[in-house]
Amino acid sequence: MNVAILLAAGKGERMSENVPKQFLEIEGRMLFEYPLSTFLKSEAIDGVVIVTRREWFEVVEKRVFHEKVLGIVEGGDTRSQSVRSALEFLEKFSPSYVLVHDSARPFLRKKHVSEVLRRARETGAATLALKNSDALVRVENDRIEYIPRKGVYRILTPQAFSYEILKEAHENGGEWADDTEPVQKLGVKIALVEGDPLCFKVTFKEDLELARIIAREWERIP
């Protein structure tokens, strides 16, 4: 059984909106509904768990009617806490693999879902990633240090893992920027799957405007 964990518990403070960004509506759908739709259509996904804050349960319930949705789980104050809540909920389902995705990345393709899961079956863990094409610098005390961009990737989501591996990685708690970091500390090789720029994270108002433009054509994009 392959289960997608859709993280939608963030506060979206950098967006400066009245509601969390994952619940902002673009082209008739809330942001979280775009990746959810991809998971529901994907033959590689058997079930979906949506993680959000208690006060948004009713909103999500009204928007979600599908047999693949296994449940809505209350998220924590941090990303890692939300992932652990989902893993605990999934114990009774005994999934083989779980796929973790940020709801703030609305434009998820089915082919990436399938490929990340395929690579996770080979190594135990895989993540969507994008080669960096920009110049990179580190700034410290007003000094700029250039970082070689060869071999540098941007880590995206979705990220797929053996359920048992991800559960073990989170057993001792901790706070992580994503889930590949604690998994790698177990000595598990992380497979990288080449993504594309469409899988960007909506963080600022400018990102939301770009998302509106893409959403108008999203159903036509293969």
UniProtKB/Swiss-Prot annotation:
Site feature Positions MEP for the nucleophilic attack, where: 149, 201
Record's keyword annotation contains Nucleotidyltransferase: yes
NCBIfam families listed in its UniProt record: ispD (TIGR00453)
UniProt similarity note: Belongs to the IspD/TarI cytidylyltransferase family. IspD subfamily.
Keywords assigned by UniProt, alphabetized: Isoprene biosynthesis, Nucleotidyltransferase, Transferase
Gene Ontology cellular component terms for the protein in this record: cytosol
Superkingdom to which the source organism belongs: Bacteria
Gene Ontology BP annotations: isopentenyl diphosphate biosynthetic process, methylerythritol 4-phosphate pathway
Coiled coil start-end: none
Protein name: 2-C-methyl-D-erythritol 4-phosphate cytidylyltransferase
